[in-house]
């Protein structure tokens, strides 16, 4: 009774704190001058990470197994992983515009975990015999850590594409407006326009330099985080194959979860391969990573929606 009450308290506190933190992030993202609010939001994310850690430990002690046996527990662990990656990311690179991209991931994941869709899973249950092995901790934890890192890296790549294509659209519209300028202007008007253009170009060059720095940071950090996630994902797939061989006598069975895990691994393997070619860095590799963002969610939730295959124990039903 005490553990279940403590679990509910930690769940509500973690979601409330991360909700307030996301609101502060949005304010500081729009109004960059308010530095004190950014520090408060980071303290909120730290508190969220501690609450989620306490929640996982409480559920572990109460259920007597590592909390990764169903969709609810894996979502809590995913939210914890996202918050930890966010804190590491913020420690290495203290930039509020990058933190504002990674922080909402923990918010939406935690929000879905505590929603009414998974109410039946909030109560801890006894593990089925197939899951009462040490491979559960090794395999599932590596997979979820891989999902968390790949999701963060994919979000950074998506942000890179948004910034880049927004710039391209603006340049296209400006060039189009320049073509439609009336040719009946006198010399003084043209000279006045050139002077305004020079002032505009000076301010634009500073803005472009800042945008270039942001794009470079997004590209660099997305590559680093995706590389880390790919290592976790590979370790999770290999440990799962060994576990499957011990449990079912076959390393690979091509059920829905395994198939989509292989597709996810292939997509991000292609991404890392494109990074070896300097011509494919930046936008081209970011497109591949953005595709991977959708693939990860299909892999993570697809089998839970279908409720079939060897991994159907984590379905909604």
Swiss-Prot record:
Compartment annotation: Plastid, Chloroplast thylakoid membrane
Residues annotated as transmembrane: 9-29, 46-63, 71-91, 98-118, 143-163, 225-245, 258-273, 286-306
Entry coiled-coil feature ranges: none
GO terms of biological process kind: cytochrome complex assembly
Keywords recorded for this protein, A-Z: Chloroplast, Cytochrome c-type biogenesis, Membrane, Plastid, Thylakoid, Transmembrane, Transmembrane helix
GO CC annotations, alphabetized: chloroplast thylakoid membrane
First-listed, main subcellular location of the protein, grouped into a coarse class: plastid
Thylakoid is among the record's keywords: yes
InterPro entries (alphabetical): Cyt_c_assembly (IPR002541), Cyt_c_biogenesis_CcsA (IPR017562), Cyt_c_biogenesis_CcsA/CcmC (IPR045062)
A Pfam family that the UniProt record links to this protein: Cytochrom_C_asm
Lipid bilayer topology: Multi-pass membrane protein
GO terms, molecular function: heme binding
Functional description taken from the UniProt entry: Required during biogenesis of c-type cytochromes (cytochrome c6 and cytochrome f) at the step of heme attachment.
Annotated family: Belongs to the CcmF/CycK/Ccl1/NrfE/CcsA family.
PANTHER family documented for this protein: CYTOCHROME B_B6 PROTEIN-RELATED, HEME EXPORTER PROTEIN C
HAMAP family, alphabetized: CytC_CcsA (MF_01391)
Subunit structure: May interact with Ccs1.
Protein name, per record: Cytochrome c biogenesis protein CcsA
Organism in which the protein naturally occurs: Citrus sinensis (Sweet orange)
């Amino acid at each position: 009774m005490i553990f279940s009450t403590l679990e509910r308290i930690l769940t509500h506190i973690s979601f409330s704190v991360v909700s307030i933190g996301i609101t502060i992030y949005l304010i500081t993202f729009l109004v960059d001058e308010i530095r004190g609010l950014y520090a408060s939001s980071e303290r909120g994310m730290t508190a969220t990470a501690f609450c989620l850690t306490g929640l996982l430990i409480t559920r572990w002690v109460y259920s007597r197994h590592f909390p990764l046996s169903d969709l609810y527990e894996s979502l809590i662990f995913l939210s914890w992983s996202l918050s930890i990656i966010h804190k590491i990311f913020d420690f290495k690179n203290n930039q509020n515009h990058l933190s504002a991209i990674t922080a909402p991931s923990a918010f939406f994941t935690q929000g879905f975990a505590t929603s009414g869709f998974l109410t039946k899973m909030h109560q801890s249950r006894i593990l089925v015999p197939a899951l009462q092995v040490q491979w559960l901790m090794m395999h599932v934890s590596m997979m979820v850590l891989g999902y968390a890192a790949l999701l963060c890296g994919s979000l950074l790549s998506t942000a890179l594409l948004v910034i880049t294509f927004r710039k391209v659209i603006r340049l296209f519209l400006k060039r189009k407006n320049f073509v439609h300028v009336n040719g009946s202007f006198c010399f003084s008007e043209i000279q006045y326009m050139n002077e305004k253009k020079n002032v505009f170009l000076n301010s634009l060059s500073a803005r472009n330099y800042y945008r270039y720095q942001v794009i470079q940071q997004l590209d660099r950090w997305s590559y680093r985080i995706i590389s880390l996630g790919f290592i976790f994902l590979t370790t999770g797939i290999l440990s799962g194959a060994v576990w499957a061989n011990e449990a079912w006598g076959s390393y690979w069975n091509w059920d829905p979860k395994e198939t989509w895990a292989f597709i996810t691994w292939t997509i991000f393997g292609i991404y890392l391969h494109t990074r070896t070619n300097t011509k494919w860095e930046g936008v081209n590799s970011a497109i591949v990573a953005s595709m991977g963002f959708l693939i990860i969610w299909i892999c993570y939730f697809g089998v839970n929606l279908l409720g079939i295959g060897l991994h159907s124990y984590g379905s909604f039903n």
